[in-house]
Swiss-Prot record:
The lineage of its organism: Eukaryota, Metazoa, Chordata, Craniata, Vertebrata. Keywords: Cell junction, Coiled coil, Cytoplasm, Cytoskeleton, Isopeptide bond, Phosphoprotein, Tight junction, Ubl conjugation. It comes from Homo sapiens (Human). The gene is FRMD4B. Residues 1018-1034 have a biased composition (Basic and acidic residues). This is FERM domain-containing protein 4B. The keyword Coiled coil applies. Residues 576-614, 635-698, 712-735, 752-786, 905-925, 1004-1034 are annotated as: Disordered. Residues 542-971 are annotated as: Necessary for adherens junction and tight junction localization. Member of GRP1 signaling complexes that are acutely recruited to plasma membrane ruffles in response to insulin receptor signaling. May function as a scaffolding protein that regulates epithelial cell polarity by connecting ARF6 activation with the PAR3 complex. Plays a redundant role with FRMD4A in epithelial polarization.
Length: 1034
């Protein structure tokens, strides 16, 4: 029992001691692990700080070159990747650097390329301790080395291909690997000597990739196969071996392709290959044959987003047949997926490869023909031996290159031996640069001289910056008319009213500007364009000055002060004929902007009567440009003058006329009196733009005139088919202002207008209170107020409504034009004026009259019977409805009476011999050709009732020595003695969307001059019959 008990106690003690020991060991181990982890953290933190500290000063990098050299660099934070590539290329004397790049392996094991425009340290370089490993390699491949210009580039391509084959980046079959290994031996060691030497050299040279050794476990078999090919190429030079090696590699399908592992939408793995040919999709087990190949010319767009890379491909086989497709047809998107860093690398590579493809495509025309491979082989053979020996000696040297802030300092690197030829090339290049810089400097000096001369012309003093050669004197500069001025010294800031003080300051400044502008405008020896522009600037300055003055007066009145009396007058030296651009371009967009005054032409569209503006507006008279027949014949166009702007705030000084009279000048009459239309031929010989004006009744004008005195318009050398001069001026006709194009004859005389001479203008001034000017030669407006808009004549530039169209006419139809001398009216009721209001004809009857009237004269065209210029022609008989018999008989009687009276007067005038009226009547001639022969113009009747103006005939008593005032409208009329054709046919069955018409007259220079002389010599007086009735012209 005792022994058993003791054994139990010993076992217990042994177990307890063992437990305590195990517990102690585990505790110590736990403490050791915790302390060790803390020590690791401290050490890691210290190393990290050391790396950060080192990053601020630069980062150590090691560049592996293609010839197995390694360059250690201290890369500074500001160093660009392009500068680093230049540094590496300088160690090879490499000229064609566009094919190469620098790559690195990031923390994920993916290959990335440095972007040349970015800093080196801005890339995601690996954060492993020690120097960062960079690789110098070929980034952009080409079809053949024959396109390379430099032999150094060819050799680097060879070294890059050899490295890619050895690393397995280019997949090659085993038999091809044995051939390539044989060329490597021939290039490095020369011809075959022995198997032992060959086997020894193969172990040192990068000949077998890992994949080949895995396929053939026996190294001796691989070496034997290489020796067999090595014996076959005995006798090849080094250059030939390199060329043959590159020919085989370039034929491989995987040459020049950058592969990236991606997945599709279904998650299946693929290889994405990017090369100079395009983008290909390969099976994960096969990099040789692509499943899909998208050439660069097929791709439309490349983009990536986070983990997705997509390309837009244009496939002509996928043309969409949907009519609702608005985008480009045949486009589809191909998408691949990977991690974000890899997707970005793929996108950068694709963009750079596509840009390289475009650059090569554009520069192919500049690239010379490819060199022969034999020539390349000879170049490589000559430099092979020297370069090989040089590379062997350099392997033993330690190399360290410092790059700081972009400046590259090399110590212990290769001292490249520059040949004399390269030195000469460098010198020539520097001389060219020097020459270009000198030329640029001379251009800058010339520009500086021009600037200094310009400054001297303005200031009168030559600046000291003017460049002078040695012994050269500064040129003498004539100072131009200065515009400098001094402000009033008494103008001091006022604390009482700063706003008024500011206005006063602006007024004084503007006043000085006006004086300066006046000086410039009065400069002699200026061309017409510059002088006109300066006068325009002067006028604008005056306008601004008047605005400031008005603002000052308004402010003073608002503040309860007395307005200042400043005389802002537009000087007389602004000649209206030279500054006519101020009035020629005046248009009224609103009737309220236009005012009408006695002796002033109204706007082309009638509007509501306005009261006279006050005198404060400063409008006392309007300047009109005088036109001459000679100028109009030279310019071959008619000029129509507009009134000067009514909103002018200046007070125009009164200019005395040459005739010594105090009345205002007569405005230029530039309208055709036959139709109150103005035919203005433009550059086109086939079309012209016509704008018809109108004469409107002004209530304020009529109120100022005596009702018992006759009211008429006076014009020289003018003809109108209407001969009424109403004695009361109570009813006027108007024609809407319309613009249209009409066909004009290709050849023929030019049509122009005549202005009133001095005597005629003087006669008119003497009868100012009885004379009214108009904007056209049309009849006064007789329309009733209820036929318009609320009794007010509205202004409109749009064509009239369709209710006023005549459905048998077209505005642009080419037809023989005829116009009987009647007027075109606004609507059905306007302008239907008759001597006896109780027998007014209907609209339909007026329209039928016009048709028959035109047809009859067209049929009688051969007769050419002369007519009295003031006679209303007899209408032919035509059967009509019974309801119209009375009206027709009335008109027939009126016409007969009218013709008898005019024939009696005409027969009485023949006895007067060579009187002024005889010349004038012969000039008047016949009215058969109111339209030009053969002229194709749009026939546009005004309404269904184009009324003809007629007058009642009375006794031929009275003095009619100067009958030119009778029947003449307010605008010019051609003075041709004879006409070549009768009335044309006005009827056209085509519909007419607008109401437009035109008239063209002829002017003969000889007759016109004769008429003008006769008119100047005659006394221009007007006599009225005592027994004339209201509305009757005799």
């Amino acid at each position: 029992m005792a022994s058993v008990f003791m054994c139990g106690v010993e076992d217990l003690l042994f177990s307890g001691s063992r437990f305590v020991w195990n517990l102690t060991v585990s505790t110590l181990r736990r403490w050791y692990t915790e302390r060790l982890r803390a020590c690791h953290q401290v050490l890691r933190t210290w190393c990290g700080l050391q790396d950060v500290y080192q990053m601020t000063e630069g980062r150590h990098c090691q560049v592996h070159l293609l010839d197995d050299r390694r360059l250690e660099l201290l890369v500074q934070p500001k160093l660009l990747a392009r500068e680093l590539l230049d540094l590496v290329a300088s160690h090879f004397n490499l000229k064609e650097k566009e094919y190469f790049g620098i790559t690195f392996i990031d923390d994920t094991g993916q290959q990335n390329w440095l972007q040349l425009d970015h800093r080196v340290l801005d890339h995601d370089l690996p954060k492993k301790p020690g120097p960062t490993i960079l690789h110098f390699a070929v980034r952009f491949y080409i079809e053949s080395i024959s396109f390379l210009k430099d032999k150094t580039t060819v050799e680097l391509f060879f070294l890059n291909a050899k490295a890619c084959v050895h690393k397995g980046q280019i997949e090659v079959e085993s038999e091809t690997i044995f051939k390539l290994a044989a060329f490597i031996l021939q290039e490095a060691k020369g011809d075959y000597t022995s198997d032992e030497n060959a086997r020894k050299d193969l172990k040192t040279l990068p000949a077998f990739p890992t994949k080949t050794l895995q396929e053939h476990p026996s190294l001796a078999y691989c070496e034997d196969r290489v020796i067999e090919h090595y014996l076959k190429i005995k006798g090849l030079t080094r250059g030939q071996a390199v060329v043959q090696y590159m020919k085989i590699v370039e034929a491989l399908p995987t040459y020049g392709v950058h592969y990236y592992a991606v997945k599709d939408k279904q998650g299946l793995p693929w290889w994405l290959g990017i090369s100079y040919k395009g983008i290909g999709q390969y099976d994960i087990q096969d990099k040789v044959k692509p499943r899909k190949l998208f050439q660069w010319k097929q791709l439309e767009n490349l983009y990536f987003r986070e983990k997705k890379f997509a390309v837009e491909v244009h496939d002509p086989r996928r043309i969409s047949v949907s009519r609702r497709t608005f985008g480009q047809s045949g486009l589809f998107v191909q998408t691949w997926y990977a991690n974000s860093s890899l997707i970005k690398s793929i996108w950068v590579m694709a963009i750079s490869q596509h840009q390289f493809y475009l650059d090569r495509k554009q520069s192919k025309a500049k690239i010379p023909s490819a060199r022969s491979l034999d020539e390349i082989a000879m170049d490589l053979t000559e430099t092979g031996t020297q370069r090989a020996s040089k590379l062997v000696t350099l392997e033993t040297k330690s190399q360290f290159i410092m790059a700081s802030n972009g400046s590259l300092i090399s110590s212990g690197s290769q001292d490249s031996e520059v040949s004399e030829e390269q030195k000469r090339e460098k010198i020539l290049e520097l001389k060219k640069k020097e020459k270009l810089l000198q030329e640029k400097l001379l251009k800058k000096v010339e520009e500086l001289k021009k600037i200094c001369l310009r400054e001297a012309e303005l200031t009168g003093k030559m600046p000291k910056e003017y460049p002078l050669n040695i012994g050269e004197k500064p040129p003498q500069v004539r100072r131009r008319v200065g515009t400098a001025f001094k402000l009033d010294d008494n103008l001091l800031p006022s604390e009482e009213d700063p706003a008024l003080q500011e206005l006063e300051s602006n007024f004084l400044i503007q006043q000085k500007l006006v004086e300066a502008a006046k000086k410039l405008a009065n400069e002699p020896d200026l061309c017409k364009t510059v002088k006109k522009k300066r006068k325009q600037d002067y006028t604008d300055a005056m306008k601004k000055l008047q605005e400031i003055e008005n603002a000052i007066n308004e402010y003073r009145i608002r503040c309860g002060k007395k307005p200042s009396q400043k005389a802002t007058v537009l000087p007389e030296d602004i000649i209206p004929s030279e500054s006519s651009s101020l009035s020629d371009t005046t248009t009224y967009d609103d009737p309220s902007d236009a005012f009408t005054f006695p002796g002033q032409r109204s706007s082309s569209v009638p509007h509501s009567p306005r009261i006279l503006p006050p005198k404060s507006l400063g409008i006392e008279r309007i300047h009109f440009r005088k036109s001459s027949i000679n100028e109009q014949f030279v310019d071959t166009r008619q000029s129509r003058e507009m009134l000067s702007t009514h909103s002018s705030p200046y007070k125009t000084l009164e200019r005395r006329p040459q005739g010594g009279r105090s009345m205002p000048t007569t405005p230029v009459l530039t309208r055709n009196a036959y139709s109150s239309s103005h035919l203005e031929p433009e550059s086109s010989s086939q079309h012209c733009r016509q704008r018809s004006g109108s004469l409107e009744s002004q209530s304020h004008l009529l109120s100022e005139m005596d009702s018992d005195k006759p009211f008429f318009s006076l014009s020289k050398s003018q003809r109108s088919s209407s001969t009424e001069i109403l004695d009361d001026g109570s009813s006027y006709t108007s024609q809407s202002s319309t613009e249209y194009y009409c066909v004009t004859p290709v050849t023929g005389p030019y049509y122009t207008t005549q202005t009133l001479d001095t005597r005629t203008r003087g006669r008119r001034r003497s009868k100012k209170q009885n004379v009214s000017t108009s904007n056209s030669g049309s009849m006064p407006n007789l329309a009733q107020k209820d036929s318009l808009r609320n009794g007010v004549y509205s202004k409109s530039q749009e064509p009239p409504s369709s209710s006023y169209y005549i459905a048998g006419y077209t505005p642009y139809a080419e037809c023989d034009f005829y116009y009987s001398g009647g007027y075109v009216y606004e609507n059905d009721t306007e302008g239907q004026y008759s001597v006896n209001p109780s027998y007014r004809s209907s609209a339909h009857y007026g329209y039928e009259r016009q048709r028959d009237y035109s047809r009859s004269f067209h049929e009688d065209e051969v007769d050419r019977v002369p007519h009295n210029p003031y006679a209303t022609l007899r209408l032919p008989r035509k059967a009509a409805a019974k309801s119209e018999h009375i009206t027709k008989n009335i008109h027939k009687a009126l016409v007969a009476e009218h013709l008898r009276g005019w024939y009696q007067r005409a027969s009485g005038q023949k006895d007067q011999g060579h009187s002024p009226q005889t010349s004038f009547d012969s000039d008047r001639g016949s009215q058969r050709c109111l339209g030009f022969a053969g002229l194709q113009v749009p026939c546009s009747p005004s309404s269904r009732a184009s009324s003809y103006s007629s007058v009642s005939s009375t006794n031929a008593s009275g003095n009619w020595r100067t009958q030119l005032t009778i029947g003449l409208s307010d605008y010019e009329t051609p003075a041709h003695s004879s006409y070549t054709s009768c009335y044309g046919n006005v009827y056209n069955p085509l519909p007419s969307p607008s109401r437009q018409y035109t008239e063209i007259s002829q002017l003969d220079g000889t007759d016109g001059n004769q008429l003008e002389d006769n008119l100047e010599s005659s006394e221009q007086r007007l006599f009225w019959h005592e027994d004339s009735k209201p509305g009757t012209l005799v």
